[in-house]
């Protein structure tokens, strides 16, 4: 059985980790960073950029650079939070045929699952490069407060990326798992405050030691799936745009290019103000009007920043109160508070958490990496590499069906440990009713319309009978991923209907399959592009080396030979400008052949001398090498 990797698919950044023996290893990406921006860009030539390369070109390609896509996953286009987001992003958010929130890049319509799959592919490739073999299985984390549609959509993104998602686990639970392995004492109650780029979760977790086995049990969870660092950025962007409009009478929000530059500056300002009292925002030539170019120059103090985000920080405290109440605990009964997510680096956030829980939050957990590490540990549990950990997670929201009068009847209460199964018997509302519609809901409101509709299905061919006589057993079954299966059975006929909830929205199996094939096709394109780049690099090196040799040894070269070499160089330089790898390879070989005699002349005599000299050095140096290096290091340190 291969390794099951752990992926933290974040709103702003993503991270991948794997279990190596008993240790958890966070895997750096190809650029050497331990986290990767969750940004996907579509270039004019069809190339798809992911991570740092996508982030670097965002200012010059704002409409085709997609960020914070996780906030759209599993959501409807007409959701109030999505409507609000449309004004804050530089790309186009559209409604799909089924009403889901999708994005448009050029004339191409993309689901958030497809875009997220790009980031997952990058994480998969990062792990494969490190492990040296193909990776097909993963544990992916989601915010604890994600509903069923959002969980299913995340699983679909994994499938499109070529991964079998062995488990979906909640981010705070994953962080507690990483923390609980070595830092927590037995029988502790911990609060995981997880404020990431786009989502907020609070989980109250009990870690117990049962005969040498760590049991990590979630007592309650709560949160807000549209609250995070992106919102901190947005209020700074709003402030900058408002002040600039007052000063220059130009609305930066109408200029996509300017808006992207302001967004980058806002993110930098937020980060700087976590360690400094004041920051400067300098954006020359940010925009222009009839009077000429406009420059943005502004100072933001930490006090101003805190006044802008105060309402957002306070929004995170109400879920904390609810989570404690649901767990039947007071703040004083919490042994440790763990901060997870990059946004917890903001001093005001840390102060608010300290004030609410009455204790200093722990700082010995890396807020960017803990979630991926916990996912890797869960991967180790599933593959059998880790056998001393038991994870008991919960469902974040109540589940039920709509009954007479538009009321929601709950079958499974929120914070129920999963997996779980619950059945309840219902009946008909009319005489001789031959069919019933089972409308599945998720949420805490008594009125059906106030909750999230997960989907509906019909149970028909019910034998005629007076109202209230037929007995229809409805069963809710939640798996370990928090994904729901619902069945309804007429007890008289044993006729049964059941569905895995995919909501009224979501992707069909055919759509997912098409996206998987599309992703595979792109993988082949990406491989071809990589081969082309490598061929160009090799050709460039050949041109540079040959020109250098001609400069150094040109006097001793016959005119005809020199002319042939120069023609071969010109041909290869022309080939490099094109996109045909075969032509580049052919012209590279032609230059190698044309310059063979020149290379032989250049390296014959000096090469022999250099070899002899090198041999002599090796003989003389002997054991002194270690001492010499040791002395040199000490000199540097003095």
From Swiss-Prot:
Signal peptide: none annotated. Induction: By stress conditions e.g. heat shock. Residues 603-638 are annotated as: Disordered. Residues 621-638 have a biased composition (Acidic residues). InterPro entries: ATPase_NBD, Chaperone_DnaK, Heat_shock_70_CS, HSP70_C_sf, HSP70_peptide-bd_sf, Hsp_70_fam. Pfam families: HSP70. Transmembrane segments: none annotated. Residues 603-618 have a biased composition (Low complexity). Keywords: ATP-binding, Chaperone, Nucleotide-binding, Phosphoprotein, Stress response. The modification Phosphothreonine is found at residue 199. GO terms for molecular function: ATP binding; ATP-dependent protein folding chaperone; unfolded protein binding. Belongs to the heat shock protein 70 family. PANTHER family: HEAT SHOCK PROTEIN 70KDA. Acts as a chaperone. This is Chaperone protein DnaK. It comes from Hydrogenovibrio crunogenus (strain DSM 25203 / XCL-2) (Thiomicrospira crunogena).
């Amino acid at each position: 059985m291969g390794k099951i990797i752990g992926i933290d698919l974040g709103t702003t950044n993503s991270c991948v980790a794997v279990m190596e023996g008993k240790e958890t290893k966070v895997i750096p990406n190809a650029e050497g960073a331990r986290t990767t921006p969750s940004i996907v860009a579509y270039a004019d030539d069809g190339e798809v950029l992911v991570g740092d390369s996508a982030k670097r070109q965002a200012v010059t390609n704002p409409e085709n650079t997609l960020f914070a896509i996780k906030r759209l996953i599993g959501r409807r286009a007409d959701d109030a939070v999505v409507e609000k987001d449309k004004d804050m992003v530089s790309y186009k958010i559209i409604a799909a045929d089924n009403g889901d929130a999708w994005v448009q890049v050029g004339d191409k319509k993309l689901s958030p699952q497809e875009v997220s799959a790009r980031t997952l592919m990058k994480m998969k490739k990062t792990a494969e490069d490190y492990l040296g073999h193909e990776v097909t299985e993963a544990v992916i984390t989601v915010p604890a407060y994600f509903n069923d549609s959002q969980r299913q959509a995340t699983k679909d993104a994994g499938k499109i990326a070529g991964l079998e998602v062995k488990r979906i686990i909640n981010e705070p639970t994953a962080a507690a798992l990483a923390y609980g392995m070595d830092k927590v004492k037995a029988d502790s109650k911990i609060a995981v405050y997880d404020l990431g780029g786009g989502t907020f979760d609070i989980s109250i977790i009990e870690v117990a030691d049962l005969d040498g086995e760590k049991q990590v049990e979630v007592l309650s969870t709560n949160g807000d799936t549209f609250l995070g660092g992106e919102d901190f950025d947005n209020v700074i962007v709003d402030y900058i745009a408002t002040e600039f409009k007052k000063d220059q009478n130009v609305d930066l929000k109408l200029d996509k290019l300017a808006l992207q530059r302001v967004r980058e500056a806002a993110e930098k300002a937020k980060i700087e103000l976590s360690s400094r009292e004041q920051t400067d925002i300098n954006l020359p030539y940010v925009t222009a009007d009839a009077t000429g170019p406009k420059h943005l120059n502004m100072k933001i103090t930490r006090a101003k920043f805190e006044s802008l985000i105060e309402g957002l920080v306070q929004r995170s405290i109400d879920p904390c109160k609810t989570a404690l109440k649901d767990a039947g605990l007071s703040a004083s009964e919490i042994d440790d508070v763990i901060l997870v997510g990059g946004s917890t680096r903001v001093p005001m956030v840390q102060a608010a958490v300290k004030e609410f829980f009455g204790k200093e939050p722990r700082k010995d957990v890396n807020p960017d990496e803990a979630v991926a590490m916990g996912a890797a540990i869960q991967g180790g549990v599933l593959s059998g590499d880790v056998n001393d950990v038991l994870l008991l997670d919960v469902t974040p929201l109540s589940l039920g069906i709509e009954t007479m009068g538009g009321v929601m009847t709950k079958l499974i209460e929120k914070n129920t440990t999963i997996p779980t199964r619950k059945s309840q018997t219902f009946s008909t509302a009319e005489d001789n009713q031959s069919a019933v519609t089972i409308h599945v809901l998720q949420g805490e409101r008594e009125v059906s319309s106030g909750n999230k509709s997960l989907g509906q299905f019909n149970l028909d061919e019910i034998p005629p009978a007076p109202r209230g006589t037929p007995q229809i057993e409805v069963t809710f079954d939640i798996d370990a991923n928090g994904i729901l299966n619902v069945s309804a059975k007429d007890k008289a006929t044993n006729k049964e209907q059941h569905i895995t909830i995919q909501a009224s929205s979501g992707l069909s199996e055919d759509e997912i399959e098409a996206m998987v094939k599309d992703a595979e096709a792109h993988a082949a394109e990406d491989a071809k592009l990589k081969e082309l780049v490598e061929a160009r690099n090799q050709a460039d090196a050949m041109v540079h080396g040959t020109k250098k040799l001609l400069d150094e040894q040109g006097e001793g070269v016959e005119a005809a030979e020199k002319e042939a070499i120069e023609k071969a160089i010109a041909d290869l330089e022309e080939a490099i400008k094109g996109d045909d790898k075969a032509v580049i390879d052919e012209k590279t070989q032609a230059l190698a052949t044309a310059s063979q005699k020149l290379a032989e002349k250049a390296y014959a005599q000096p090469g022999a001398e250099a070899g002899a000299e090198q041999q002599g050095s090796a003989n003389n140096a002997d054991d002194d090498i270690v001492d010499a290096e040791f002395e040199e290091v000490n000199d540097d340190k003095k």
